[in-house]
Amino acid sequence: MNTMIPGSDRTPTISFSDGVFSITGRSYMENSAEFYAPIKKLLENHQGMLHVEIGLDFLNTSSSKCLMDLLFIVDKKYVAGNDCKIKWSYKIDDEDMRDAAEEFRDLLKHVPMEFEEIDD
């Protein structure tokens, strides 16, 4: 199943195709739980390989919790034997996003997670 949700100035661009889930842009909408609920269901129902690519510029507190919920799903799928990994890209000078990525990594117990610093 292929899914594409275009982003806005407050919502991230989401794409999901052939086991690759990508989230880029900014995430600071009013009701993060409502926005992420169908994405959570999509990940829960997905079978097989699941590679996550994160490239966020900004993430508010409620979006952060929703993203963590999504990544816990990926972690559980990895433990169940699925081919899963997470790649988090952030701008080389964005210490806040780097710190957020490292905090997420510390909370995830199993799934491999790599970081990529990118130029502006």
Predicted regions mapped to residue ranges:
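Extended lipid/amphipathic-ligand handling interfaces
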Residues: 43
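Short acidic DE-rich linear segments
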Residues: 115-120
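Amphipathic alpha-helical interaction surfaces in cytosolic regulatory modules
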Residues: 33-40, 49, 54-105
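STAS-typified acidic loop motif
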Residues: 1-37
